[in-house]
């Protein structure tokens, strides 16, 4: 009696939500939580949330209070991050400091 083994939680590889840095091309799209932000929006099922509201909502629950679906926790940036080449910093030197 009571000698059952608990199942290990399945680690599902959830899809990444799209991060939209500027939603002006989508028409009048705003965060459905604060209704203020239209930049830095994240897709949450059938609506958008700004990063500030998403962070706040994730600190309280993993479910969206608007659509009741799981909140997105992984983001897919709309543009690949870039950085200058490692050798570029050596060839460009700032001018000497003079007070």
Curated annotation (Swiss-Prot):
Protein name in UniProt: RING finger protein Z
Classification via InterPro entries: RING_finger_Z_arenaviridae (IPR024183), Z_RING-type_Znf_sf (IPR038485), Z_RING_Znf (IPR003224)
Major localisation: virion
Lipid modification (N-myristoyl glycine), residues: 2
Effect in UniProt of substituting residue 2 to A: Complete loss of myristoylation. Complete loss of virion budding
Similarity comment: family membership: Belongs to the arenaviridae Z protein family.
PTM annotation: Myristoylation is required for the role of RING finger protein Z in assembly and budding.
Localization (cell): Virion; Host cytoplasm, Host perinuclear region; Host cell membrane
Effect of residue 97 to A: 90% decrease of virus budding
Origin species: Lassa virus (strain Mouse/Sierra Leone/Josiah/1976)
Region (Disordered): 74-99
Gene transcribed to yield this protein: Z
Membrane-related topology note: Lipid-anchor
Pfam families reported in the protein's UniProt record: zf-P11 (PF03854)
């Amino acid at each position: 009696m009571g000698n059952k083994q608990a199942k290990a939680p399945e680690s599902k590889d959830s899809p990444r939500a799209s991060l939209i840095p500027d939603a002006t091309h989508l028409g009048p799209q705003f965060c459905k939580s604060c209704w203020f932000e239209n930049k830095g929006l994240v897709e949450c099922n059938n609506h958008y949330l700004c990063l500030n509201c998403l962070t706040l909502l994730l600190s309280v629950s993993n479910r969206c209070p608007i659509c009741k679906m799981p909140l997105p926790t992984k983001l897919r940036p709309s543009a690949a991050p870039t950085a200058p080449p490692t050798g570029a910093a050596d060839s460009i030197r700032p001018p000497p400091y003079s007070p």
